[in-house]
């Protein structure tokens, strides 16, 4: 092989010399090629090299390949500048390197940027223009490619500390102008100069930038030294913006240290290079981090003046120096003043002229931050039982942790590039070293890890080392498990490793860090080169070192062309031996070896070393200090942002320590959470606020009110809490301080906020529950602030308590806040284009984790999203100024609009962002809100989390409700402006209405307040009574006039006159008592009862009719007596007492032989029966066992005097009391009554028995007299029967006439005997003589009052034009009761086992309504399951499904035959037992109705409403009725189970379907209709908008939107969404979706479609009242045809759009999707952690998973 290889070497060399070759660039040196002699075969394919198969070296890795394996070429990464027209040089590479180049690992430049990482630093650079520098003589060198080997070994010089004396002296000079103060809340304008480096490792656009990156940072590492580790001082806390004085850096940096060319300084760099660098440094546009999708936005209406461009013009600057342009040659001098280590700088280095509002807020800020942070750390230590104060010689942990936390936070400036996170927790590591003292704990400005050098002879301590980081392994084989021939392997490996080490050594590194293993040969070669090796380093640790030192990670040795080295001040390895051993540990002492990279130039990481305790205690301290660092960092940023905004906070007392319960300490359940009294910091909901421990506020001039937050602590089980990173735990624990619901202020008159000791934080509760004190937060769903009388959105709370609490209870197990919920904010984001009037991105939910991967710095958000003029909207292609962005959260919306200015704002090249605001509440200046002076945003404010910025904007607690200089709320009352270049963004907060969702209630609510129609009815009754009494009065006057004007021919004229006077007195008394009693009844109101009961009014009307008949008969009798006494008459004929023979004849026909003349009654009305409705509902018998009326003892004294009129010549004026056995003797005329044969009948009747006369006519129940005298009932109440008894007293020879009102039994007989089956009824054809006007008025009303009494004597008049009155009467009829009872006696709620007496013993004044007697009918059943089983069982027989009731009325309006068919009678009755308080309420409501012109429908069917608005009556078509007959059993089952299991449902309950028919026998008029009775979803509501939604916009638009009761459709809602959106809370949205999901699944299962969601917007209560209606239609063949016609477009309309009528499954999907999109969810504390955007297809996915299982969805938590 060798002979072939060297066959003709001379000839080959000669031929090669003839071929012209281009000169190799320095980085293509053949020194790093594999020797030809050691490579006889191809590295890749093992092909033997011959004269014809020549060797080819890869120009990148140096290995030898054949022509086939090295046939690729790439552009040469040469440093030489090429002309634009000249093609770039190409070099040969192997297949492996070519693939690496294609994948982007090897960039097409000089290889310096091995991994291209986009990043940027904080761009504010506000001090560029205002800073001068004297350090322009600083020389900056740069070298391209590998550094030439210096004369003196650089590694040797860095190992001798004495060689650095000159640098140290320069360090002291720089140090004298810097402070050692590290107070953490002071924030630095970190980029106050033009920097020639980037803020993160791994990015370079050129070699000069690579080395410049090191130079700037490295040069300042001298000046900074250890001056970051001084004591924390609060004296200069107010100096936020820092000094911009010149800082001389007079260090002449040696070329062998800096690596810069000696002939290039800062002045030689042109402006273009600086601009390019600034754009690279500040231009976040390089990072195309995709923001989450947006949804359509709803911006509140802006005021008119906002459209005026003058409003957007920036005001004058506060500091004129900020407007000066930068002097580019001086930029390098700012490096030391800037402090490249983090935002926070020593406070005494600030220039007072740059501090804004320092006089007002400095003291408050200092006290707030210092006191709050120390209190937080103290309580964290207290929770872990760690010593806080000094113990002997040992210093307490409180001061140590406070100092270390602030120091670590000071050193941080997180890389906010795409590759770096914002979370400071990822940049701080804590190491526990159980030795030394506590005071020896320190912060290392760099990386500390458990590693050691690979060889003991390698140097372990190097000052100013150069670090080279190599990824992968340093081995020969670059591909795992590759096979080679053994004979060449060893030689090739040694040659390759020599080449690799030589390549490494060419860059002069002091330390080589390798990710994986290193060959033993390579280790020996590195030792010989005096390069310290550290191998097997984890990738994460390698990246940390790279980030802090600035070194780039070279992927492999093949790409090691021009790497970027890292630097630090000191590299050393130390070994620590444990001196503190915990009691549980073995006595053996352990050793720990740590490697230090101290003094790193990048502010991207530090390490805290904890000493002075055993391992267990240090772990606890580690836990606390991780919290402390994050809190300090976060407080610092927010404090700086607060200062930039010019806000002020109150200086509040710091007396009570706070308590924080740690999530990983579940055993300590007694850890309460309280706060510092009267104090809140600006960290919004993530910082502790204040609370009083039940003691009054101490006098404080700055304390104007109590602060409270909306954040509610929670109970719930957290899994894996120990895995939560420290920043998450800290944010959560800071959140737990904000756990007072609004009721803590509103419920206390003395203004004290109770402690939260009773609201303990528990993370391990087996069954998550909501504590009682949290309900106010849920029901209010708002946050309150009481600060000097300033309250936000407090009016919303009271109107939402009931419904929101109901929603909370209905879904207690849904979503409870977890630890992750408190470290992020969930907002709804939307974007719309104003220029085009289109929605670019629909509203969607976006969760931003604070300082997380999806978060952005505030400044970067402004630059990328709002100020980038090159970025256009992908939806509408319009620029940023054409759009409005809207973020909504809780009770507010933040609207962001952008405009372009006519002139540039200063400082665009330096990245200056200007801030100012205009107060909307201050007096206008020239018609515009006054503006503050504009200032430049500080770097710390620039780096504030945008998520936290949003939280501050939305929060209502005191930390966010900061006060501007004018005294108004900064976020609520001011327009906030941010400007950059020509662009200005305006942020405006506006309160929004968040609606609660109200589903149809399971138990219907009946409003018992006075209703207008009831008032009208009661007035009509009074009017009719007055007409009656006036007529009686007139008749009495006429009769009396006859007695006065005619001569007496009788023997007792005086007695007759006296009797008439007594009758007149009785009339006046009755009139007065009637009015007084009725008025008293109307004025006495009881809860849950009708103030005016229509059933009482009906009974009164019926009784007045009987009263009119009695008075008419009485007056006729009186007139006959006058005629008999004063006129000539036969002596042997007795007077006709009853006056008219017609009535007596009809009574005789009814087999009423006599009327008892002396019936003892109580002074109570029939309306007073205490158990009236109870009888109706439970079937009680109210006849006592003796069959007698019981007389209450307490009313005996109120019994009125006897009201009879009698005149007896023998007895004079003495009352004649007759025993009950006495009867009126016949006076030889047929007009006298015989009563002897009625005694037994009446007794039986009163007890409740029924008798039938000989001719089959129903005999009424009656009652025998029980006392020895005639008692007229108490007439003080109109409700009493007007008992006008005519009584004929016994006489011997001379006849005696006694005139009395008829006894109660007379009217009772009339009530029971009044049967329209008899054409000879007394009153049906009666023509009144004396009360004709009243009778005419009554008949004219159309009420048929003389129908037989219903069950339990209910009086329900029938109106021919009101079908519900026919239904109501049918439901109370005995025929209906008999059909309903059947064989199932237990379900009989209208039992008639006992007769209901008209005159019971309970005083009417004790009752105001029949509702006192109502009993929930569901009590008669054992359980809901029994109801369902019985209900289904009864449906097995068709004859049991429907009940048919017929009756006839022969009243004065005419004879009519009525018929009512009750479909599914028993099932509906069982449903009403569950849904209605009682059957009586249902019947009472149906008693009256009115025709109603319902809008929105197209069916043109009959609609009616019950007069109390409780029910809707809708005509049902034949098809709908047939459909319901089919799916009726499924409907009853679904609705009953939903109610019993409390599963959400939005179905509007149908409580009955009836067929009503009537036929007038005269004229033949007929009426027949099928109707359903449905609950009125809009009962007792005032709606501003009403929608009927089907989920389709096709033909769903109502152009008439002006009417008050106009029903709007889908397209109307879609059009209104941009301007008047409907916002709902997260729980309300989930409740709505669950209900709709359940109902649509059920409706689809029974093949129902074309239903609608009726939505009423109640702005008074902030509620959405909704329910699904019109679900009676199944998808039958006609609907199939309609779908086809509408789809084809034969009858008009778009052909491609989906019709409104589609299959049930398609309808369900479309309906769900639309209802989800129509109602926008505003995130709140109940929002789930994982959010699915509203416009996603998740509904369809869930549908397949839970198909046809709506109950599972409803019950799932």
UniProtKB/Swiss-Prot annotation:
Catalysed conversion reaction: a 1,2-diacyl-sn-glycero-3-phospho-(1D-myo-inositol-3-phosphate) + ATP = a 1,2-diacyl-sn-glycero-3-phospho-(1D-myo-inositol-3,5-bisphosphate) + ADP + H(+)
Subcellular location per the Swiss-Prot or TrEMBL entry: Endosome membrane
UniProt GO molecular function: 1-phosphatidylinositol-3-phosphate 5-kinase activity; ATP binding; zinc ion binding
SMART domains cross-referenced by the UniProt entry: FYVE, PIPKc
Main subcellular location: membrane
Protein name as catalogued: 1-phosphatidylinositol-3-phosphate 5-kinase FAB1A
Ranges of compositional bias, category Acidic residues: 317-337
Reported cofactor(s): Mg(2+); Mn(2+)
Job description of the protein: The PI(3,5)P2 regulatory complex regulates both the synthesis and turnover of phosphatidylinositol 3,5-bisphosphate (PtdIns(3,5)P2). Catalyzes the phosphorylation of phosphatidylinositol 3-phosphate on the fifth hydroxyl of the myo-inositol ring, to form phosphatidylinositol 3,5-bisphosphate. Plays an important role in maintenance of endomembrane homeostasis including endocytosis, vacuole formation, and vacuolar acidification processes. Required for development of viable pollen. Might mediate recycling of auxin transporters.
Pfam families membership: Cpn60_TCP1 (PF00118), FYVE (PF01363), PIP5K (PF01504)
Annotated knockout phenotype: Leaf-curling phenotype. Root growth inhibition, root gravitropic response, and hyposensitivity to exogenous auxin. Fab1a and fab1b double mutant displays an abnormal vacuolar phenotype late in pollen development leading to inviable pollen.
GO cellular component: endosome; endosome membrane
Regions of compositional bias (Polar residues) in chain numbering: 134-145
Bilayer disposition of the protein: Peripheral membrane protein
Tissue: Ubiquitous with highest expression levels in pollen, seed, and senescent leaves.
UniProt keyword Transferase, yes or no: yes
CDD domains: Fab1_TCP, FYVE_PIKfyve_Fab1, PIPKc_PIKfyve
Coiled coil: 1014-1087
Domain PIPK: 1395-1719
Keywords per UniProt: ATP-binding, Coiled coil, Endosome, Kinase, Membrane, Metal-binding, Nucleotide-binding, Transferase, Zinc, Zinc-finger
Subunit structure: Component of the PI(3,5)P2 regulatory complex at least composed of ATG18, SAC/FIG4, FAB1 and VAC14.
Binding site for Zn(2+) 1: 42, 45, 66, 69
Compositional bias segments (type: Low complexity): 1729-1739
Region (Disordered): 125-193, 276-297, 313-346, 684-709, 1729-1757
